[in-house]
Amino acid sequence: MITEFIDGLQQFHFLQNALITAIAIGIVAGAVGCFIILRGMSLMGDAISHAVLPGVALSFILGINFFIGAIVFGLLASVLITYIKSNSIIKSDTAIGITFSSFLALGVILIGVAKSSTDLFHILFGNILAVQDRDMWITIGVGAAVLLVIVLLFRPLLLTSFDPVLAQSMGVRVKVYHYLLMVLLTLVSVTAMQSVGTILIVAMLITPAATAYLYTNSLWSMMLLSSGLGALASILGLFIGYSLNIAVGSCIVLTSAVFFLISFFIAPKQRKNEHALSSH
């Protein structure tokens, strides 16, 4: 199987594109996912990843690049969720649930109008083996831009993630960085549609970051480990999916889940926590 996969990489351009794209998505999703984990925003990641669906469907209807529609609707969902939470007594999980279900319902309606089930099926569940050169370079470009923003604004992102009250008292514009993170999350969700589809994007964001969190208390180390695990899961998932002729996106997600399951039992932080619980 390994030999056949390596031969395929040497012979088939589509497999080369798939590998490069999968690694790029694994790295950037792993990095952004760390901030999502630390802020307790896993539900927000799930909501935005599904909220891009009507944008994709509308893009097919209008005949424009689906990146445009997906980004617009992803940002719209994040702004709407934050606005509802900030300007009413409704809690964030309720705001997320309302927005998530509404956007998903709109997406289903637009899918019926678009009448392009094949392409939209790939958007829902991913088809990384169909990634073209243009899509690959867009993914690399978006991923590089997201990572650059994280590096340049690491300190305020770190501060607003761990202690937003302290950050506010120091003059840091907490809301600005919240919306910035939502923009980054939306961009990652759009690019990850290529590999795992809108249904499984949240797993690419959350699982590697959660696994890395079991091993380290340093955000830099967590980001590096999470990105590495995301890339490794993407490589192994692509290998398994291609070799067995099964869904590559699902293989990537399950591989990442296996990493988490193993780490759950062997990670030092997890074992210390179990020891502390058993001593009470």
Residue map of PLM features:
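Transmembrane helix-bundle core of multi-pass membrane transporters
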Residues: 2-17, 88, 96-155
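Short juxtamembrane and helix-loop transition motifs at transmembrane-helix boundaries
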Residues: 4-13, 27-38, 55-65, 158-166, ...
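Loop-to-transmembrane alpha-helix initiation sites
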Residues: 18, 66-74, 93-97, 135, ...
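Alpha-helical transmembrane segments in multi-pass membrane proteins
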Residues: 21-30, 51, 55, 59, ...
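Helix-loop-helix "hairpin" substructures at the membrane interface of multi-pass membrane proteins
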Residues: 25, 136-208
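Short loop segments and helix-boundary regions at transmembrane helix junctions
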Residues: 34-116, 213-224, 241-244, 267-268
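Transmembrane alpha-helical segments in multi-pass inner-membrane proteins
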Residues: 201-250
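Cytosolic-side transmembrane-helix boundaries in multi-pass membrane proteins
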Residues: 246-280
